[in-house]
Every structure is written in C-alpha cells, then in structure tokens.
C-alpha cells in the first residue's frame, strides 16, 4: 500500500467517516481515530472543532486541494447570487477532476487528477491538463484516443453496477460524457453527510 493510500485512509479514521466510500478504507474495520487514544470516546469536541471537522471532511473528499484553493472557491461562492453553500458545492463539483471521478473514468479523485495532469483527458476536443479547470454546462469530456486502453481506465469504467449522478452522462462505448448541469448538494453522492452549513459558518466568522 503506497504512502498516499495509507495517508488518505488514515484521514478517514481521523475525521470519523469514510471519505470516499472505498471498500478498502480502514475506517470500515477500525472506525476510531488513529493513535494511542483513538478509542477514547469521552473526548468532547468544541464548537469550533465541529466546524473544522465538517470543513476537513469536505475538503479531503476532493483530494489534494490546498486550504488556500478551498477558501478561494468559497470566496467566489459568496459573491455569487443564491445560497452560498449550494454555490460552494456546485463550484467544487464543476472542477474537471471532480467530473472525471463522477463519470467513473478514474476510480479515485486522486487518480482523476493524475490522469488529467498527464494529458489523458480532453474537453470539447482539446487536451485539458489542469485538474481545477471549471466546466460549463454542456462541456464534453472524453479520454484521449491513445489513452483508452490504459488499465486504470478500462478497469474503472468496466466495473459492474456503477452509475453516474444525474448531472453527468457517460457512454462506455465511446468513452465520452457530458457535464449536464451544476448539481445541488443533495445531488452529490457523498459517502458521508456533508455539513455544508458548518463550513459556511466557519468561513463567515
């Protein structure tokens, strides 16, 4: 198991949820914090601690987003019309790495970023190698022709029982899909309950 994989599973245990719904996640068998005092359930979390944990869960779910990037996305969401929390999740889900992951082109958000940065993904017929690229409704995402037989891609798209969320479409035969619309919070299939309101409160202080 690589250092990154160990680190991400440790994050699930530290934050008390399975962050990606992965069957290999150590949280499934050891649902307590790592470390000497991990099983101690008597530790009381402060109000600030609850807000911070809510933020960390969502931030970790989207992979290696820095705190600066995460806060900047929130700042942009605040300036948009409508509900800040909904805007925030909509912006996070509109990122290219999020959509490649949601389309099941990549098995994890981490491998999604890697496929993009290595030039295996195209948007509207052009190579797209920036994971944070914000997609617009109607954008077409496809796997570069020369990359379509890659083992990680073939294994991911061929998994039985997989479905895509309603805000994307994906055709397994053509290995291409479309970003249909900006999702609401309830549209996103988080493996935990996202307490977005706590993140809004934290960043609005």
UniProtKB/Swiss-Prot annotation:
Residues 94-172 form the S4 RNA-binding domain. GO terms for biological process: ribosomal small subunit biogenesis; translation. Keywords: Ribonucleoprotein, Ribosomal protein, RNA-binding, rRNA-binding. The keyword Ribonucleoprotein applies. SUPFAM superfamilies: Alpha-L RNA-binding motif (SSF55174). SMART domains: Ribosomal_S4, S4. The keyword rRNA-binding applies. GO terms for molecular function: rRNA binding; structural constituent of ribosome. Signal peptide: none annotated. Part of the 30S ribosomal subunit. Contacts protein S5. The interaction surface between S4 and S5 is involved in control of translational fidelity. Belongs to the universal ribosomal protein uS4 family. One of the primary rRNA binding proteins, it binds directly to 16S rRNA where it nucleates assembly of the body of the 30S subunit. This is Small ribosomal subunit protein uS4.
């Amino acid at each position: 198991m690589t250092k990154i994989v160990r680190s991400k599973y440790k994050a699930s245990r530290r934050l008390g949820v399975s962050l990606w719904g992965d069957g290999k996640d150590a949280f499934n068998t050891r649902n307590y914090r790592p470390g000497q005092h991990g099983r101690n359930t008597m530790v009381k979390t402060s109000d600030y601690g609850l807000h911070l944990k809510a933020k960390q869960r969502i931030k970790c779910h989207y992979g290696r987003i820095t705190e600066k990037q995460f806060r900047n996305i929130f700042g942009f969401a605040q300036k948009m019309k409508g509900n800040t929390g909904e805007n925030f999740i909509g912006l996070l889900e509109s990122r290219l790495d999020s959509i490649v992951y949601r389309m099941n082109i990549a098995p994890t958000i981490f491998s999604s970023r890697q496929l993009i940065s290595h030039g295996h993904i195209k948007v509207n017929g052009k190579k797209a190698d920036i994971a944070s690229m914000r997609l617009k409704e109607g954008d077409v995402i496809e796997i570069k022709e020369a990359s379509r037989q890659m083992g990680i891609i073939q294994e991911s798209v061929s998994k039985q029982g997989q479905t895509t969320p309603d805000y994307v479409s994906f055709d397994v035969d053509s290995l291409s899909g479309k970003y249909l619309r900006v999702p609401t919070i309830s549209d996103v299939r988080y493996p935990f309950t996202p307490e977005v309101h706590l993140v809004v409160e934290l960043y609005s202080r």
